[in-house]
């Protein structure tokens, strides 16, 4: 006498449920809500910090450190960075120099540009407005990476103000031949990708960038 095995229970409902559960839990694991600006300001400002209204709707975070009668050095940070880049320099040099550093629009505590101008020319204009507001007529300027590109462009546009130029791995002049932007920049410009990345980009990926 032979017996037939009972049909195996269908596993598709279980598999489907696990997939749906993963799709729900995975975004929650990477969800990174914006930190309120007031919280960031309280954490990262120092007694040397001020917020300068250099343009309508734009308050630039500036630190002014060192003796007021010392030679002036203005430092410009790179892309996806902030004026904190220069804290080791400030610690070493602020006894002999008046060091002015700032967060460029879209970086650090300065926040977004109301005109969405993140071009090199726009950054040069902001640096010039900060210098004018501080009453600077002669100073050295330095920058690293993108900030180095801003620094040399500023020096080229205002040579009469510059006593020295410091470039640390600075961005160079644009190529005469048209080149495609990196894939990451292309993705960042796509509305839906940008909106998702703002909320779900893993912090570990930012820290490694």
Predicted segments — roles?
Residues 50-58, 63-65, 104-142:
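Active-site loop/oxyanion-hole signature of alpha/beta-hydrolase fold enzymes
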Residues 58, 64-109:
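Conserved HGGG/HGGXW glycine-rich cap/lid loop of the alpha/beta-hydrolase fold
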Residues 85-87, 110-116, 176-179:
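Conserved catalytic-core motifs of eukaryotic protein kinase domains, centered on the activation segment
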Residues 87, 128, 152-156:
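Short, hydrophobic alpha-helix immediately C-terminal to the catalytic nucleophile
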Residues 143, 147, 151:
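Gly/Ala-rich beta-loop-alpha elbow adjacent to hydrolase catalytic centers
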Residues 152-157, 163-195:
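Flexible "cap/lid" loop of the alpha/beta hydrolase fold
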